[in-house]
Amino acid sequence: MITDCQAWLQEVLREFSCQTGTIHRSTPDGTHLTLVTQIGVPEVLLDKISLIPFGKGIAGAAAERREPVELCNLQQDLGGVARPDARKTNVSGSLAVPIFSSDGKTVLGVLGIGMMAPHDFTCEEQAALMAKTLPLREEFER
């Protein structure tokens, strides 16, 4: 059980050597993501990430596609999914993974991490971050 989402996210960022992170939860109708907590996102962007439609931006793409979305260098290439304002984070390497319900049918939210340096997240790193979503699933299903 997660008692402090902010502290939990900080530990995930430490484990992955990342400087920014977000946790979003799906709205009851399953069409948007609402921000639960964040670390390292500039204040000017908070209103833009507080409610994200499925399919928009990195987190929205991960929710809609139901799979990890990874960008090596957000500063140079938006990868067809990131919004131009995402560059204001100063993040280069980024990864967002969906949080699935116990039965795997529903996207409960998205966990996102980012680092300042360009980085290609490996399949192993993507799988490791997906595994980290288990406590969030338990929290969101309560």
Predicted segments with their positions:
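A short, aliphatic-rich beta-strand micro-motif
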Residues: 93-102
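Sensory beta-strand/linker motifs that couple input domains to effectors
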Residues: 105-115
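Regulatory sensory and allosteric helical modules in signal-transduction proteins
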Residues: 26, 44-77
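GAF sensory/regulatory domain recognition
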Residues: 11, 22-46
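Short hydrophobic/aromatic beta-strand element in the GNAT-like acyltransferase core
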Residues: 20, 96, 110
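Signal-transducing coupling segments at domain and membrane junctions
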Residues: 42-45, 72-93, 115
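Amphipathic alpha-helical coiled-coil segments that mediate homodimerization
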Residues: 3-23, 58
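Regulatory loop-to-helix N-cap segments in sensory/regulatory domains
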Residues: 114-132, 139-142
